[in-house]
Amino acid sequence: MTRVFSGVKPTGHLTLGNYLGAMRRWAAVDQHRSDALFCVVDLHALTVDHDPARVRRLSRQAASLLLAAGLDPELCTVFVQSHVDEHARLSYVLECVATDGEMRRMIQYKEKAARERVRGGSVRLSLLTYPVLMAADILAYGTDEVPVGEDQTQHVELARDLAVRFNQRYGHTFVVPRATSPAVAARVMNLQEPASKMGKSDDTGPGIVYLLDEPDVVRKKVMRAVTDSGRDVVYDPEERAGLANLLEILAACTDGEPAELAGGYDSYGALKKDTAEAVVEMLRPVRERHMELSADPGYVDGVLREGAEKARAMARPTVDDAYRAIGLLPPVNAAR
């Protein structure tokens, strides 16, 4: 059976972009067709300045939202990255086959490091090595497929390169993974800045629809979405990005095609109204289930505890094999 691994980083409240770009497919498709693992990658949240209490709070919220979005612990494994030591263990070993040049060529590193310097901050080493930890997340589980947005495909390519390089140098140890992404709404854009991804860490709150936004807040944000000065509704991502973003969101909510949907509207207002209502109705069961889970923290704790145990049992043999392959002496009670 195909093994799938993907994760969410608790650096902000999860958004419509997270849901349409990843979480909905995880629940509707990936957990049913594969041996799937979904992880709250909290270690990745430490690469920049952060509030420890907020990271803990958002980690729990992210786990609850994964379950609220439809992930079923009976069908897949849901856990928190830092609860499974094998991620950190494997990350160091992979750093020993990665190169400094590879890390500095990562697009996200360049962008995030530049923003940090503009703010007058120092760039943490963990930001540079972030892609290696992500590779460890993937390779520890013998992952075949990694559902990601297009902004993360370079990191999956690095994981592939490190797996191949390690296998060639030290013997076959890792499955070589591949990135996958849905055709529609793989990258939902900011409603106020349609050239930018709708990111949970952004400061432009009016342009971001959060999964836990109240329905009236969702409606207000969509109705105020940036479009252009035109009047006709056409699907043109290159020239009319804001309008195209609304059509893509509506298409993702209704299983339609953006270009075909455009033909059914003669005004931006009507399109915005229908898009807002489609988003509200799609997110309604997620919000309601999240409220139920928030009232039962013991259930979420149990899911995460059992998920970590399952994940650890899957990852440990691969990580132990990697340690032996690269030349590390195993503990006496684990010697072969």
Curated annotation (Swiss-Prot):
Binding site for L-tryptophan: D137
Top-rank EC class of the record's enzyme: ligase
Extent of motif 'HIGH' region: 10-18
Annotated EC: 6.1.1.2
Reactions catalysed, as given in the entry: tRNA(Trp) + L-tryptophan + ATP = L-tryptophyl-tRNA(Trp) + AMP + diphosphate + H(+)
CC annotations in GO: cytosol
Binding-site residues for ATP, renumbered to this chain: K9, P10, T11, G17, N18, G149, E150, D151, V188, K197, M198, G199, K200, S201
Extent of motif 'KMSKS' region: 197-201
Signal peptide (residue range): none
Subcellular locations according to the entry: Cytoplasm
Keywords: Aminoacyl-tRNA synthetase, ATP-binding, Cytoplasm, Ligase, Nucleotide-binding, Protein biosynthesis
GO biological process entries: tryptophanyl-tRNA aminoacylation
Pfam families: tRNA-synt_1b
GO molecular function: ATP binding; tryptophan-tRNA ligase activity
Role played: Catalyzes the attachment of tryptophan to tRNA(Trp).
Self-association and partners: Homodimer.
Protein family according to the UniProt entry: Belongs to the class-I aminoacyl-tRNA synthetase family.
Identification of the protein by name: Tryptophan--tRNA ligase 1
Organism: Streptomyces coelicolor (strain ATCC BAA-471 / A3(2) / M145)
Gene: trpS1
